[in-house]
Structures are given as structure tokens and as C-alpha cells.
């Protein structure tokens, strides 16, 4: 397995973010490599300080990791408000608009962010881009009418492929849907417009753009952490 050149940066970000965790909090746990480090850091703090916290996870992988490390988890159908949601991102532009969902959990990730009083995105410096799109844009689509949905997307100029799993079959999300990865267009200077256009298509469950009020912490190889806020409501 290829070594992650930003692993130490992600660990530092995770430790810094874990300092925000206070007794009595309900945490939203994101998905991906940076969120994995945050879960580990929170578990260590929970164990060392006997911290009274609970959490809800955006993916089966994050849920399993948190459970294995002793973080108490709540029923993912019963939470209403989350105190702090921490997640990563695949790309972030200068306006702090981002693409998420590379791990296939965008629908649940967005619900956790929407439900949280404080939303924190952790990202290493490689995730900062001038224009969104090079990573690709994942969207979650319904199995029902799959071919029709994809045909509609292609007619609008959104070309891509259904994501495959490691066994060669179609990748299935935790919600039993498909992921369609758009590779053309590969630049989104006005993601708000594309987001609205895509969400008007029946059968699209969620789109990988995140345009919301969030804090973003960028971690750099020199050990510095840059903290920014969108200022959006």
C-alpha cells in the first residue's frame, strides 16, 4: 500500500480538532482518511479523560472504527442536533466551496453537517485548488431508473461512469444507491449553478458539492495550521 505523504499532517489536524471535544457532546464523525485520524484522537481522549461523549457516524467504516475504539454511538435514526461535526474534503476552492464524497458517503455526510451547530472540515494542503473539478464530482443516484438518470445527465453534458467496487461490481452506498462519478466537465467555476441543475433531476439523491457555512482547517507539511471560515449562514 502506498504511504500517505500527508499522514502526519492529518494526525496533527485530528489532535488539534480533538481539543474541541467537551464533556456531554454529541459528535458527528465523517468519512475518509482524515476523519479516521480524528476518530482515533477522540477515542484516545475519551479513554484518557473518561470523557462523557456520544457520536454518530456517516459511514459503516467510521461507525465500525469508532465502536472498536470504545466511542459510544447513538442510533443513527434518532439524533436531532449535533454539537460538533468533523469531516474531510476532496477539494476546496478559495471560497471554501468543496467537493466531498470520494468515499461514497456524501448523503450521510451532508446530513451530519446540516444537523451540527459547529461544522469543521480538516484538510491537508493538497486539497486546496483554484477551481473545483479535477478530482471528479461524485453524485449518488437511485437504482430505479438508473439508465434513464444517466442518459439525462449525459444529455446535459455531465459525462462519467458508475463507480465499481474492488470486486468489479457496482459500488453500493450505505443507503443502497449507486455512485456516478462525473469526469466531464472537469472544472466548476460556479458550482452553485451546477448543484441546482443536478438536483432538479429526479433520481439524483445527492451531489458532491458542499456550499455551506463551515470552518476549514488546512494542515501544512511545515506543521502550521491555517484556520478559515466561510462566513456563509
Curated annotation (Swiss-Prot):
InterPro entries membership: NagB/RpiA_transferase-like, Ribose5P_isomerase_typA_subgr, Ribose5P_isomerase_type_A
> Residues that bind substrate, according to the entry?
31-34, 87-90, 100-103, 127
Q: Which GO terms describe its molecular function?
A: ribose-5-phosphate isomerase activity
**GO-annotated biological processes:** D-ribose metabolic process; pentose-phosphate shunt, non-oxidative branch
Catalyses which reaction? aldehydo-D-ribose 5-phosphate = D-ribulose 5-phosphate
GO CC list: cytosol
Pathway in which the depicted protein is active: Carbohydrate degradation; pentose phosphate pathway; D-ribose 5-phosphate from D-ribulose 5-phosphate (non-oxidative stage): step 1/1
Q: What class of enzyme is it?
A: isomerase
Q: Any idea which UniProt keywords this protein has?
A: Isomerase
Q: Which Pfam families match?
A: Rib_5-P_isom_A
| Entry EC number(s) | 5.3.1.6
Subunit text = Homodimer.
Against HAMAP family, the record matches this protein to: Rib_5P_isom_A
Hey, which family's this protein in?
Belongs to the ribose 5-phosphate isomerase family.
- Database matches in NCBIfam families: PRK00702.1, rpiA
Supply the name of the protein: Ribose-5-phosphate isomerase A
| Species assigned in the record | Chlamydia abortus (strain DSM 27085 / S26/3)
Upper classification of the source organism reads:
Bacteria, Pseudomonadati, Chlamydiota, Chlamydiia, Chlamydiales
Amino acid at each position: 500500500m502506498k504511504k500517505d505523504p500527508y499522514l502526519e499532517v492529518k494526525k496533527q489536524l485530528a489532535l488539534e480538532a480533538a481539543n474541541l471535544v467537551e464533556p456531554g457532546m454529541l459528535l458527528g464523525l465523517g468519512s475518509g482518511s482524515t476523519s479516521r485520524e480524528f476518530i482515533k484522537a477522540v477515542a484516545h481522549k475519551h479513554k484518557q479523560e473518561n470523557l462523557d461523549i456520544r457520536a454518530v457516524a456517516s459511514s459503516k467504516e467510521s461507525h465500525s472504527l469508532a465502536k472498536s475504539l470504545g466511542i459510544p454511538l447513538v442510533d443513527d435514526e434518532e439524533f436531532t442536533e449535533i454539537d460538533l461535526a468533523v469531516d474531510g474534503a476532496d477539494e476546496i476552492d478559495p471560497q471554501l466551496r468543496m467537493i466531498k464524497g470520494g468515499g461514497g458517503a456524501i448523503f450521510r455526510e451532508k446530513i451530519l453537517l446540516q444537523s451540527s451547530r459547529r461544522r469543521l472540515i480538516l484538510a491537508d494542503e493538497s486539497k486546496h485548488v483554484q477551481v473545483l473539478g479535477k478530482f471528479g464530482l461524485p453524485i449518488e443516484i437511485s437504482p430505479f431508473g438508473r439508465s434513464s438518470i444517466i442518459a439525462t445527465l449525459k444529455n446535459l453534458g455531465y459525462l462519467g461512469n458508475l463507480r465499481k467496487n474492488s470486486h468489479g461490481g457496482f459500488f453500493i452506498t450505505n443507503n443502497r444507491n449507486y455512485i456516478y462519478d462525473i469526469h466531464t466537465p472537469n472544472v466548476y467555476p460556479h458550482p452553485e449553478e451546477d448543484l441546482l441543475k443536478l438536483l432538479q433531476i429526479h433520481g439524483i439523491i445527492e451531489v458532491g458539492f458542499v456550499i455551506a457555512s463551515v470552518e476549514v482547517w488546512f494542515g501544512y507539511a511545515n506543521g502550521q495550521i491555517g484556520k478559515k471560515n466561510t462566513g456563509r449562514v
